[in-house]
Amino acid sequence: MRFQGFWLCLGLLFISVNAEFMDDSVEMEDFDENSEETDELSSEIKYKTPQPVGEVYFTETFDSGRLAGWVLSKAKKDDIDAEISIYDGRWEIEELKENRIPGDRGLVLKSRAKHHAISAVLAKPFIFADKPLVVQYEVNFQDGIDCGGAYIKLLADTDGLNLENFYDKTSYTIMFGPDKCGEDYKLHFIFRHKHPKTGVFEEKHAKPPDVDLKRFFTDRKTHLYTLVMNPDDTFEVLIDQIVVNKGSLLEDVVPPINPPKEIEDPTDEKPDDWDERAKIPDASAVKPEDWDESEPPQIVDSSAVKPDGWLDNEPEFIPDPNAEKPFDWNEDMDGEWEAPHISNPACRIGCGEWSPPMIDNPKYKGIWRPPMIDNPNYQGIWSPRKIPNPDYFEDNHPFLLTSFRALGLELWSMTSDIYFDNFIICSEKEVADRWAADGWGMKILIENANEPSIFKQLMSATEQRPWLWFIYLLTAALPIALIGSFCWPRKVKKKYEDVAFEKLDICKPQTKGALEQEVKEEKAALEKPVDLEEEKKQSDGEIVEKEEEGEPEEKSEEEIEIIEGQEEGNKSNKSGSEDEMKEADESTGSGDGPIKSVRKRRVRKE
């Protein structure tokens, strides 16, 4: 059981490691063709521009190669230098760099470190009423992403909306999509909620997803982002058709939709005599007479002695004798060249002026302070009193947001070649799913077909994780060990199995004179020491002789203990018969007739 449990744990470990490299978020068919077959697959696929099935508010595939209906912004950002305030970032319509499908094009952000703004009007405004909102589009960070976003804005349906003036402060209803800067990976879902009393809009941020978003920014694959808002005030955020975030518009956004009923009174002030001190010095405490505050915390160690070999006149650092002035060193511009300093090899023990080390002063007590006691006048931490919130309201249906009538991308990025494709806004998730299957589904088909084999993925994984070689070797040995354990199981002998219980040897009849002679010889042997080698040979000879007479096999210590236990049991059961044998011996002991004696066979122990 221990053997099988070990390999079971090893198998589970390998599965957990392998899961790190497998995309378990998307359930797609595995393709195991080689590179030639995948090239043929890409050329054989007949791409067809997706067509919406059902009511839609906006669709865009960019397959026509033209930006028909899209408006480039001519606005300028406020509060920044004029040189960088212009939205002069470049957009192009191109196919994907990798895993391209002939005829499938997308909108590509082409400029680095520039502001980009482009927008398009919906076929009809979306009004939040009794139908869900479904927003979906594709993003591919073809060169990865250092710092930048790929989110969209749904621009509010206002009278002053002008797409040529679209900039960062243009009023929007929803902001949705991926964003990254540094190591902060985000998937925004922000909506602007209107205060019913003051009319002021406030941004509400959905809680962050519970999944690691890093791979969606770094794997250079096309990913599908979907937002679903329902009339029951719930929402879902999906990546590649997998829900990564969901919740309630009333409970899972920050700040909350409804303000608190009571707020702190801004006019309330803390009284001057309010005592917030929980502890105060004990006024009745007196400093001890022997308390010396003049002693320093550390003193010179008077017992320290300068180590032998300490060089007082040697510098601790010296110029590097092996250093050479760079060939391009210009003394007029760079100044006089000096060799870098290195540790003085002669200062192995120490160099420079020696001074004894400092140690803690055992007499140090520091400045005396009275002990702290509970404050009898403690009133607690003061806080302003609560008053009814004059701006309080209760909105139990936050889904009813401001309608929108345009979609825009207002982005700044330090990385170029961000690919956008297949925008759709509708009210039915099934319509968006069909749209995704005809567009994004084709891209995933090609990407999976061009994926390297499992073997190549495992080998490439070891470049960053060398410890995986150990897992691979153990995993390779797993089936061999299991087959061996089942085909050639280890034979385990049962305890006491094949133990032969043999009868005690009964010596040949001996005369009384012969017994007396043996007794004399034993006494003589005890009185005269015998050479160890002769004794060993004699004992070996006796054992060999007895083995020839009786049993040819030797018995283990456990078998001897069993035999002795049975002999002791037999003694108690056969006490009557032994008494009779003794009486028979005594009756024949007066003469030289033969007698019988029972002996226990000596067994050599190895």
From Swiss-Prot:
It is a single-pass type I membrane protein. GO terms for cellular component: endoplasmic reticulum membrane; nuclear envelope. The chain crosses the membrane at residues 467-487. Residues 265-275, 545-567 have a biased composition (Acidic residues). Residues 313-346 are annotated as: Interaction with PPIB. Residues 255-308, 518-606 are annotated as: Disordered. Disulfide bonds join 147-181, 347-351. Residues 488-606 are cytoplasmic. Residues 1-19 form the signal peptide. Keywords: Acetylation, Calcium, Chaperone, Disulfide bond, Endoplasmic reticulum, Membrane, Phosphoprotein, Repeat, Signal, Transmembrane, Transmembrane helix. It is found in: Endoplasmic reticulum membrane. GO terms for biological process: binding of sperm to zona pellucida; ERAD pathway; protein folding; protein-containing complex assembly. Residues 518-544, 568-579 have a biased composition (Basic and acidic residues). SUPFAM superfamilies: Concanavalin A-like lectins/glucanases (SSF49899), P-domain of calnexin/calreticulin (SSF63887). Belongs to the calreticulin family. This is Calmegin. It comes from Bos taurus (Bovine). The gene is CLGN.
